[in-house]
Every structure is written in structure tokens, then in C-alpha cells.
């Protein structure tokens, strides 16, 4: 067994320090929504209550003198979203802590090369993934702070940053920021029948699916918040912002379905958390239609909005059935221990071989 180099030891120490910051940031993210809901703790308003949605009028245009009510999450729905976000981050913190313990345990008995430690850290969660996770929790805290002051434009901008960070974080969790053939090579360094192999085989897929479900809800919050900012910035009909937010959510989820089948399914076959999150988001979208049915009926938009919302779960069912079909085909098919190189790598390798043959031929002639 070879001892870890100083660079590997430094890398592990900095990774554990980032993990400590991740846990501290999670604790703050869990405490902040509770503190923001209690009067007298410095928050001017109860952050889920942006406007009085009983004044919602779909036939009016924005007056630009006050906050015009548009479609957004009300207090119960926003509470559910924040609670689920905290629970997912809790599961992630537990996963990282157990992963760190597994790496320390495997380091004592299974370290076989100087690059093995770096490989284990990349498989559990690299420094970049931890940093992005810290940043996304911080932006969510900032989003809650700004909502308590009723600054919709600033809140929409901050949530845009949070959504981008969450998107990159989830994408990195699935793909590990590496090509498939590189991931297969890294997985060969995992000690068999160890805590590290258990946490990577069972803990990480569960954590990834929870983040996928959260990403689906974050797409909804981003769509509603973005169009709420647009609706309060320009002189447009409130009904246009409502339909635009629904259609934006439909486009974002459809894009993720396509990316899953074309790219992400190579890394994780069993990823159904996103579909469950989309179903939950569709139910959340239906609540305002049911709660303010008279408003939508009076504006002759009840059927239009209902049809647009119904397209989201319908597309989700189609995408989920297609994923189930491909998953069943992949389970029946024997899994290869290797992944073919892309064509560009093959062509590069062929050119190198041809150059090598030409050099050997010229040497023989000499």
C-alpha cells in the first residue's frame, strides 16, 4: 500500500473544510425560514405574503405604481417548497458526511495509488460541487431576506442566480463533470464491499433523485418569479404574464426531459425524481385556478389556463413512460465494463497510429 502524497492530504483537508462550511450553511438555511416567520426578529413582513391575491384581475394592465398581483406561490405552497428544499439539503449534508467518513475509512485500508484519493472525492462530490452547493443555499437565504422586504425585481434576480446554481449543482451531481468513459475508470478504484461503495451505490442515487425533484419545483418558482418581475416592469396584461409563466415552466421541463434521454441517462439510469417534482409543480399551479376560479372565469381564461397547465403533467407522463421503457431495455441488456470512445477520439488515435507507422517505416529504410 502506498501512502498518500502531501498534495492528496492537502486536497482531502480542504475538501473536509468545505464540507464543514456546507453543514454550517445548511444549519443557517434551516433556521432562517423559521426566524423569518416570527415577528420581532428583524424581518419587516412575512415573506410568503407578497400581495393580496384576492385583488387579482386578469383583464388589467400593470399600473407601475404598486405591486400588481400575478400568478405566484402563496404562503402554503411557498412553505412546502422551502420545507422540501431544507429536507433535500439535509439529506445532502448527511450524504456528504457519511461519504467523508467512508473516504477516511477506505484511506486507511484500501489506498493503492496516489490518485485514488482524488478519484474517491470526485465520485462522492468534488470541491466544485460543494462550493456550488454552499452558494445555492446562500442565495436561497438572500431570496427569503429580499422577499420579506417585498422587493420583487431584486428577488427575481437573486432567484435567477439561485436557479442557475441549482441547475449546475444537479447537473454536476449526475454527470460528475466527466465523460462516461472517465467515470467508469474512476469507479474501478472503489473498494468492493466497503462503506464507500455502499454510499455511492445507494446513497448518491437517492440524493440525486431528491435534488431532481427539487429542481423541478425550482423551475416552477423561477418561471413564476421571472414573469412576475416582467409583469410589474412593463405595461402588459396580467393574463399574459400568467400564461407566459405556465408556458415557460413547460419549456424548461421539456428541455430537461430531452437532456435526460440524450445525455444524463448514460450516468444514472434510475432518475425519476424530476418527474415526481413536475407532478407536484403541476398541482401547485392548479391551486390558484381552483382558488380563484371566479377570476379566471370572468376573464374568459379558465379553459385556456387549464389546458396550458394540463399540458405539463401530460408531457411528464409521456416522458416518464419513455424513461421506464428505456430503463427496462437497459436492465435486460448486459452492461459493458467499458464505454466506446467518441468518434473524435478514434480519429485522433488513428492519426497517431498512422504517424507512428510512417516513422517506423522511415527508420527501417534508413
Swiss-Prot record:
Family: Belongs to the herpesviridae glycoprotein M family.
Gene: gM
GO CC terms: host cell endosome membrane; host cell Golgi apparatus; host cell nuclear inner membrane; membrane; viral envelope; virion membrane
UniProt name for this protein: Envelope glycoprotein M
Upper taxonomic lineage: Viruses, Duplodnaviria, Heunggongvirae, Peploviricota, Herviviricetes
Function text: Envelope glycoprotein important for virion assembly and egress. Plays a role in the correct incorporation of gH-gL into virion membrane. Directs the glycoprotein N (gN) to the host trans-Golgi network.
Quaternary context: Interacts (via N-terminus) with gN (via N-terminus). The gM-gN heterodimer forms the gCII complex.
Pfam families: Herpes_glycop (PF01528)
Keywords: Disulfide bond, Glycoprotein, Host endosome, Host Golgi apparatus, Host membrane, Host nucleus, Membrane, Transmembrane, Transmembrane helix, Viral envelope protein, Virion
Positions of transmembrane segments: 18-38, 84-104, 114-134, 154-174, 210-230, 236-256, 270-290, 305-325
Intravirion compartment residues: 1-17, 105-113, 175-209, 257-269, 326-366
Annotated membrane topology: Multi-pass membrane protein
This protein's record includes keyword Transmembrane: yes
Compartment(s) of residence: Virion membrane; Host Golgi apparatus, Host trans-Golgi network; Host endosome membrane; Host nucleus inner membrane
